[in-house]
């Protein structure tokens, strides 16, 4: 299975949402667009997600759920799946990292795809 994991790439593009944020109320909204590239010869299905969100206050939140944005997409060989979601933090800086549980539909085996840590930073914050 580790061989298949090496062929699944996850790219993240975070963005601060100033219009939805209220810093005076300690509400900082970030969107993140994720592209999952399947560079393997097998179709995969994204079954579940696990996020660890660390806020600037040190508070850690774990989020687990089925699929992403209400879907459990099937991603064929050479294809990609792109979606946008959001996170609301109590401070201007945070870090997200996690993993996807995917199914190799050829072998009918589940495997984990790690998502490297990425930074969420509001305006005038060090990136």
From Swiss-Prot:
Domain of life: Bacteria
Transmembrane intervals: none
Residues annotated as domain ApaG: 2-127
Annotated GO biological process: error-free translesion synthesis
Pfam families for the chain: DUF525
Protein name: Protein ApaG
Organism: Chromohalobacter salexigens (strain ATCC BAA-138 / DSM 3043 / CIP 106854 / NCIMB 13768 / 1H11)
Gene symbol of the encoding locus: apaG
